[in-house]
């Protein structure tokens, strides 16, 4: 269950993986695009997971229709704003939304820096309207190669004040972290916090690489860490958090069942691991499902679920003062 005395967070939530089906339909019609269906009910199977996908890359293809309709910077601004609205309606007090500006710009050749500006603007408007604390994580989409990632990094750093952290996502097997060392050196020099998708499609060596070569402070998914006892020891000792996404890991065939998911093992090993969604609109789930359905099915006790909820705030890329302010806001002590 969700503890109402603790801030509810989602620190692994893709903005460009959370574009509403209705918005895809609206924007598709606005820009005269040939969508796979012209009614909401018939469009959903094309933009939402309806069965377990065979691998991560197949899962990621479900995201493509969402960004295919981003025909203008105003469209990017709209989906950013709606992401904040969705987070607030899900009951979140704090979220870190991550996005790939290159991926969002690609289909309609939008200016990448313009996409970053539009997303920052949409998030700021949403935070004002819905009274929620949202931070942005810029993604380098490794699937598109080193040069595209340099363009993304340049655009993100041009708006450093609106970006909290940098992530590496996409085809983990085809584009290992070692290709992006110089990108992350620049990001760290600019003061960005670092999280990296690792140990989702590739093995523990990908997580070691993210830590040693890219400077990862947190690991996205990190499922394969369970295969390396020394790695789990290291994660626990150095408080390198794991952003767990339970339902997502089933849908991508990263784990075969919730019962075999390693989140409970991580928590019992002393690793700071949290519960998150990943791509809510594509997955057809929200954060409540992960706490009320997925976490118990993954073998977490009520105490462990509460610990994972507390870990979400502990892992957040904000100051200790900001964390305490959130605690006081949610459960004021008179």
UniProtKB/Swiss-Prot annotation:
Parts of the chain that traverse the membrane? none
Q: Which catalytic reaction applies to this protein? A: adenosine + H2O + H(+) = inosine + NH4(+); 2'-deoxyadenosine + H2O + H(+) = 2'-deoxyinosine + NH4(+)
Q: In the record, what terms sit under GO molecular function?
A: 2'-deoxyadenosine deaminase activity; adenosine deaminase activity; zinc ion binding
Cofactor(s) this protein cannot do without = Zn(2+)
Q: Which domain of life is it from?
A: Bacteria
Concerning Pfam families, the annotation shows: A_deaminase
Residues at which substrate binds: 14, 16, 170, 279
User: What is its EC class?
Assistant: hydrolase
Q: Which SUPFAM superfamilies match?
A: Metallo-dependent hydrolases (SSF51556)
Site Important for catalytic activity — annotated at 221
Coiled-coil stretches noted in the UniProt entry, renumbered to this chain: none
Q: Which GO terms describe its biological process?
A: adenosine catabolic process; hypoxanthine salvage; inosine biosynthetic process; nucleotide metabolic process; purine ribonucleoside monophosphate biosynthetic process
Free-text comment on the cofactor: Binds 1 zinc ion per subunit.
Listed InterPro entries: A/AMP_deam_AS, A_deaminase, A_deaminase_dom, Ado/ade_deaminase, Metal_Hydrolase
Any one of the GO CC terms: cytosol
Q: What is its EC number?
A: 3.5.4.4
Residues at the catalytic site? 200 (proton donor)
> Where along the chain is Zn(2+) bound?
12, 14, 197, 278
Q: Which UniProt keywords apply?
A: Hydrolase, Metal-binding, Nucleotide metabolism, Zinc
Record NCBIfam families: aden_deam, PRK09358.1-1
Entry similarity comment: Belongs to the metallo-dependent hydrolases superfamily. Adenosine and AMP deaminases family. Adenosine deaminase subfamily.
Instruction: Write out the function statement from the record.
Output: Catalyzes the hydrolytic deamination of adenosine and 2-deoxyadenosine.
What protein is this chain from? Adenosine deaminase
């Amino acid at each position: 269950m969700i503890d109402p005395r603790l801030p509810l967070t989602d620190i692994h939530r893709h903005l460009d993986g959370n574009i509403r089906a209705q918005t895809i339909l609206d924007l598709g019609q606005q820009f005269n695009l040939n969508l796979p269906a012209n009614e909401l009910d018939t469009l959903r199977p094309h933009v939402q997971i309806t069965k377990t996908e065979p691998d991560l890359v197949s899962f990621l293809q479900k995201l493509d229709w969402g960004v295919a309709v981003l025909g203008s910077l105003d469209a990017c601004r709209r989906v950013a704003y709606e992401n904040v609205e969705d987070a607030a309606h899900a009951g979140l007090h704090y979220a870190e939304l991550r996005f790939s500006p290159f991926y969002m710009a690609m289909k309609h050749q939008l200016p990448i820096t313009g996409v970053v500006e539009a997303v920052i603007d949409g998030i700021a408007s949403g935070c004002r309207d819905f009274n929620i604390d949202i931070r942005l994580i810029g993604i380098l989409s490794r699937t598109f190669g080193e040069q595209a990632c340099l363009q993304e990094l340049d655009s993100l750093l041009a708006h450093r004040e609106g970006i909290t952290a940098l992530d590496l996502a996409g085809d983990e097997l085809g584009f290992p972290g070692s290709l992006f060392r110089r990108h992350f050196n620049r990001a760290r020099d600019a003061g960005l916090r670092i999280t990296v998708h690792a140990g989702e499609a590739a093995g523990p060596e990908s997580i070691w690489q993210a830590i040693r070569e890219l400077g990862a402070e947190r690991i996205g998914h990190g499922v394969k860490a369970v295969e390396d006892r020394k790695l789990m020891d290291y994660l626990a000792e150095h408080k390198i958090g794991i952003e767990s996404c339970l339902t997502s890991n089933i849908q991508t065939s990263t784990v075969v069942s919730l019962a075999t998911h390693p989140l409970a093992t991580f928590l019992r090993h002393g690793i700071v691991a949290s519960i998150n969604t990943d791509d809510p609109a594509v997955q057809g789930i929200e954060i409540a499902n992960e706490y009320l359905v997925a976490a118990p099915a993954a073998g977490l006790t009520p105490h462990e679920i509460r610990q994972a909820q507390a870990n979400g705030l502990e892992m957040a890329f904000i100051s200790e003062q900001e964390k305490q302010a959130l605690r006081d806001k949610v459960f004021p002590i008179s």
